[in-house]
């Protein structure tokens, strides 16, 4: 029996592998599985800056949302949205062991910050930032859209197809870098999804074409 591993299968292994690497750390931290959380936060570290102010958190009430409350919300009901970070030596830098009030200057200095609110709600960030989270989701959903449109696709998209989908993310990121505006997690989510889908659709279509040619040999 001549069995060939299809490249599209490797695509799914890679994309879903990245997805699970992203969601395991906060869930493990919430379940107090500190070693597992530490391992997966460290695995994600080379892939992302992991700034908590630019990340989504999984909270102990089952909700997913911004780790850092917006300034508008904080200003309106500041007494209800007092929050601070708590780190453990297994999950973060040893010099920040214990509890301390949130300081914007400390953002990104460690990986598994614990956001706590004074209404007993707390959570941990995903393994990667909000934009990377969206990119991973876009990579996963791209094959589904390809499958739906497969009968209408006559050839592999040009590389400019992928480049066009990167433009919104590039504009958002460059504008923030140059100080024209401060992006939000919603904008990072939208532009990341667009970029992830464009890259995923382009790569997946190429892999499908290669697999078809391999089967014809």
Q: Each predicted region: which residue ranges?
A:
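N-terminal signal-anchor transmembrane alpha helix
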Residues: 7-35
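Short, charged juxtamembrane terminal tails flanking transmembrane helices
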Residues: 1, 211-217
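Hydrophobic alpha-helical transmembrane segments
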Residues: 128-146
């Amino acid at each position: 029996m001549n069995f060939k591993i299809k490249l599209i299968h490797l695509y799914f292994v890679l994309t879903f592998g990245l997805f699970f690497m992203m969601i395991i750390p906060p869930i493990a931290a919430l379940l107090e599985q500190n070693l597992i959380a530490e391992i997966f936060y460290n695995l994600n570290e080379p892939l992302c800056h992991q700034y908590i102010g630019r990340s989504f958190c999984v909270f102990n009430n089952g909700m997913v949302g911004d780790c850092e409350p917006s300034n508008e919300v904080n200003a309106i009901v500041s007494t209800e949205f007092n929050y601070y970070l708590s780190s453990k030596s297994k999950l973060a830098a040893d010099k920040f062991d214990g509890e301390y009030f949130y300081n914007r200057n400390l953002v990104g200095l460690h990986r598994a910050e614990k956001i706590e609110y004074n209404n007993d709600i707390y959570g941990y960030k995903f393994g990667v930032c909000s934009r990377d989270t969206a990119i991973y989701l876009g990579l996963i959903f791209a094959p589904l859209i390809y499958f739906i449109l497969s009968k209408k696709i006559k050839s592999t998209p040009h590389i400019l197809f992928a480049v066009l989908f990167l433009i919104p993310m590039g504009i958002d990121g460059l504008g923030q870098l140059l100080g024209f505006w401060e992006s939000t997690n919603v904008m990072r989510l939208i532009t990341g999804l667009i970029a992830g889908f464009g890259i995923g659709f382009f790569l997946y279509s190429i892999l499908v074409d290669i697999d078809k040619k391999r089967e014809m040999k």
